[in-house]
Amino acid sequence: MLVSSSFASSIDSVMSHETMSLRRNPPFIDTPEKMPNPTASPNGTIHHLIDPSLPLLSSTTSSSRSTLSSTLNSPPPPPLTTSYSSYNSSACQSITSSPTDNTALAHNSKCYFPHSLSPTPLSSNSSSHVILPPISSFTNLITVAEREFNGRSNSLHANFTSPVPRTVLDHHRHELTFCNPNNTTGFKTITPSPPTQHQSILPTAVDNVPRSKSVSSLPVSGFPPLIVKQQQQQQLNSSSSASALPSIHSPLTNEHTSRYSSSLKDSAKITKQRKKKECPICHNFYANLSTHKSTHLTPEDRPHKCPICQRGFARNNDLIRHKKRHWKDEFMQIYARESDNNSGADDQDDTARTSANNDSDDSNDKLAASSSSEETKLLKKNQLKSLYKIKGAFKCPYNSTLINLDMEVYPHKSRSLYFEPINCHQTGVFSRCDTFKNHLKALHFEYPPKTKKEDRGVVPGKCKHCGLQFPNVDVWLNKHVGKGCGYSYH
């Protein structure tokens, strides 16, 4: 039997009132146990849904009441089957949408129910009444609404700069994929990244959501929609500002800088090596090929020749080292000449002495002893002269014996000295430069008391002969010895 137009208008008015009150306060729903018996009072089925303060049904005429009673007693239309799954999905979308959408839905639809169908009346043997959806469905709607309200209030004090946990992000991506399975190809695979790059993960997952659905309309449990939107905006701003700045701290830039600095240090420490050339005779490579070629020549044809033995050498240093070997021969030659001259003079003295003192044996013994001592002194003097005349030898400028010998050989250099010479060495002549310098540092420079041998090069001191102070022994040796102090040989 068809429902009359007056009954339909009454139902629409009641449902519109309940719809308008639902946005302000939670809906008041009675359980089936509290509902009156429909068989005892047919009109009671509608009265428990109507607010007595509204003059909606109180102003209706008696004809409307009779029409309503006759309609309730009529057989109900065939039941329409609806699925609670479609109801739940529609209810979730309607509740989590914006208030503007709720208002438009309340004004455009005839009945503000979670599903677009009218309440399903159930038939019975005696009478029929309207059965609303289960109370558990409305409880879910109320829970979602309270969660959205609490999320908006808590978002004022939320810290949006904190990183999003990876577990929540994976759950969020799973929910996005579950709610929109047709757009799974738009998601990008998020690879693990360092902790400093976690800010770029959330915008990648949220930007792929279709623009028809906002983030707040997606059912993400435990993640307030407003917080997701604000975090998305903040992450987008941070990513755009980071992309605008030059990446001066990128691993590539740091690696390039470190390699460039290390190459500069290596080039500063290592000098440029000379290019080696191949010898045409032995086919070996040498940096100084011209010097090496002289080694293939015979000793007579080499450029540096010894003036004594006429032996040739490829390098001048080899010639200097070779000349020192001739010092012994030169010393013996000089000593032989000096001894011959002195022996001739001694022979003349001996003949005069023997002719004058033939009668006294004691005097002969004394003359023999004196002659032996004089010969020893003369021998040493001749040896010193022979060493003194060797060219290239290093002579101590403070040796008293060598200074007196030089003044004797060159009388015009005899003068008073402004320093006190000492007998520091037996001869005062050295064949090697390092030995000569070690002699000067050890015997002619005064160090502070208790100075260790390894500290002599850094401690200050003074000259033993003139008393001048110097910061270290090297300054004294290079700027004072032989220039400001000491004897200059001929």
UniProtKB/Swiss-Prot annotation:
SUPFAM superfamilies xref list: beta-beta-alpha zinc fingers
Gene Ontology cellular component terms for the protein in this record: cytoplasm; mitochondrion; nucleus
Species of the source: Saccharomyces cerevisiae (strain ATCC 204508 / S288c) (Baker's yeast)
Name by which UniProt lists this protein: Zinc finger protein STP4
Location in the cell: Cytoplasm; Mitochondrion; Nucleus
GO molecular function: sequence-specific DNA binding; zinc ion binding
Region (Disordered): 1-85, 231-273, 338-375
Low complexity bias spans: 1-16, 52-73, 231-247
The organism's place on the tree of life at top rank: Eukaryota
Phosphoserine: residues carrying this PTM: S153, S155
Alphabetical UniProt keywords: Cytoplasm, Metal-binding, Mitochondrion, Nucleus, Phosphoprotein, Zinc, Zinc-finger
InterPro entries, per the entry: Znf_C2H2_sf, Znf_C2H2_type
Gene3D superfamilies: Classic Zinc Finger (3.30.160.60)
Compositional bias (Polar residues): 250-265
Pfam families tied to this protein: zf-C2H2_4
Further facts: Present with 623 molecules/cell in log phase SD medium.
Zinc finger (C2H2-type) residue numbers: 304-326
